């Protein structure tokens, strides 16, 4: 009987561990064959963060402009990536803050146009184009809670929202106007603002949904051009590999997640756990 109870306890602990490993809100599959160039004026990128050292930016210059495939019409704005290089055997964590629409290298399926600070970690600028890079997505270790700003020119009948300081990318933003019972989903623009063309005077509720399906709510008293608010919470990234920590969210840190390697596949982990428990059970029976 004691053997059976021990087996059940081990089984429960194993599946609790498996469940935790599956909670990362986005895929962390390792991607190979990426390339990178660099550019020298990374401020005022297409994602709307303006000055990178300002209140909307990441607070450092370790950023990238993404080619059209990765940029995906703004859906990867604010996503952080861990990029590894065979030239230096080092890796760097960057945040996507801009798009790279050039007709050359940026048209590749996985291309990063990096700030010089990020590029220098991966290779010498004299090389020009770095080939054979690998990367995977990681959470951004930002400080504080998710924030929201209303675009300049916003008024009682039209506004647009920028969601920033989030550990993960945003799947949807919706608004419930005073007197209404339902939320209305907004359209994300290619410059990363969520457009609301049907506002009315007065307070309203905003619902922010992460790429992992988690929600954050905030009530805003009125539309006010360039007014910024901090929500009361941050999205969870439990179970993600290579979660940055410390000031600036680990951006630019060559050691952040650099030795993690390819994240484990959940189904493989499950099979491995079941196999291990079966062997353990047979040993205990003997």
Swiss-Prot record:
Q: Provide the glycosylation site positions.
A: 82, 89
- What is the disulfide pattern of this chain? 47-77, 80-140
Which domain of life does this protein belong to? Eukaryota
Pfam family membership, one: DPBB_1
Which residues does the UniProt record annotate as the domain Expansin-like EG45? Answer: 44-145
Q: Which residues lie on this side of the membrane: Extracellular?
A: 22-265
Task: Look up the signal peptide feature and give its range.
Answer: 1-21
Question: Which CDD domains does the protein's record reference?
Answer: DPBB_EXP_N-like
Main localization (coarse)? membrane
Q: Which UniProt keywords apply?
A: Disulfide bond, Glycoprotein, Membrane, Signal, Transmembrane, Transmembrane helix
Residues crossing the lipid bilayer are 266-286
* InterPro entries given in the database record: Expansin/allergen_DPBB_dom, Expansin_CBD_sf, Expansin_CellWall, Expansin_EXLX1-like, RlpA-like_DPBB, RlpA-like_sf
NCBIfam families xrefs: expansin_EXLX1
Query: What is the protein's known function?
Result: May serve to lubricate the movement of the cellulose microfibrils during cell growth and wall extension and/or they may serve to maintain the fluid state of the slug cell wall.
Q: Which family, according to the similarity comment?
A: Belongs to the expansin family. Expansin A subfamily.
Protein name as catalogued: Expansin-like protein 1
């Amino acid at each position: 009987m004691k053997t059976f109870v021990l087996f059940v306890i081990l089984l429960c602990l194993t599946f609790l561990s498996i469940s935790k490993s599956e909670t990362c809100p986005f895929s962390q599959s390792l991607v190979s064959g990426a390339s990178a160039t660099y550019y020298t004026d990374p401020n005022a990128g297409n994602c709307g963060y303006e000055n990178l050292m300002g209140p909307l930016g990441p607070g450092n210059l370790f950023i990238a402009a993404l080619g059209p495939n990765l940029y995906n019409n703004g859906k990867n704005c604010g996503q952080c990536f861990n990029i590894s290089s065979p030239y230096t055997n080092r890796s760097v964590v960057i945040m996507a803050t801009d798009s790279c629409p050039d007709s050359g290298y940026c048209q590749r399926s996985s291309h990063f146009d990096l700030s010089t600070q990020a590029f220098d970690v991966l290779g010498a600028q004299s090389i020009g184009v770095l080939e054979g890079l690998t990367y995977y997505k990681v959470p951004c270790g930002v400080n504080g809670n998710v924030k929201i700003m209303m675009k300049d020119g916003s008024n009682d009948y039209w506004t647009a929202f920028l969601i920033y300081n989030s550990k993960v990318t945003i799947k949807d933003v919706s608004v419930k106007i005073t007197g209404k019972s339902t939320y209305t989903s907004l359209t994300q623009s290619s410059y990363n603002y969520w457009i609301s063309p049907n506002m009315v005077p007065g307070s309203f509720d905003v619902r922010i949904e992460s790429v992992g399906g988690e929600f954050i709510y905030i009530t805003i008293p009125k539309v006010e051009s360039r007014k910024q608010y901090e929500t009361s919470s941050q999205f969870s990234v439990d179970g993600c590999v290579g979660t940055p920590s410390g000031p600036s969210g680990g951006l630019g840190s060559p050691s952040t997640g650099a030795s993690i390697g390819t994240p484990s596949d959940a189904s493989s982990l499950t099979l491995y756990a079941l196999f291990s428990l079966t062997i353990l059970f047979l040993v205990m029976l003997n």
